[in-house]
Amino acid sequence: YMFSGATAFDQPLNSWDVSKVENMEVMFESASSFNQDLNSWNVSNVTDMGGMFWGATLFDGNITSWNVSNAVGVETPGYGISRMFKNASSFNQNISGWTINSSNTSFYKMFDGATSFDQDLGGWNITGIDTAEEMFLGVTLSTANYSALLIGWEAGTHNTGAVKFHGGNSQYSAGAAATARATLVSEGWVITDGGQA
């Protein structure tokens, strides 16, 4: 909660040593002026990042090299990165290389309202995910990026059964992406999106 509600704060923090910090939950929630690069932060010991940039409407700082592999959630197990970028409406960094821990069970509202976000997350580890409900609510990924997500997630190890996934207004292409989506649905996934392009 360190900068939660600090609506005028926008100072550089990239030199901070956060290597022993374990909880960054809602750290910049509603810090609506904050937009600094944090790429040098060592967040490898952080277990909770839920809501970290929730409502940080100007934030588009570089965090592409973060190691989020331990962000699995302690207070709410499995929810370590849920709501992380909710309503962070400027954020659009390439975080496709993040290592997602297989103990993460939820992408709940992770990018809900992050209306600028448009990256390919098809390479993310979704092994443990049992809900991605409202993950991209209000968001439109490009057809290429959304198609790559569907193809990558279907090809990787994933839960079957009633996994809820909201792709926002994103549309998928015919062919491999449509087939991947149909396969996930046949396995029990409940997918909401903008349909085939």
Residues covered by each model-derived region:
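Negatively charged
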Residues: 1-197
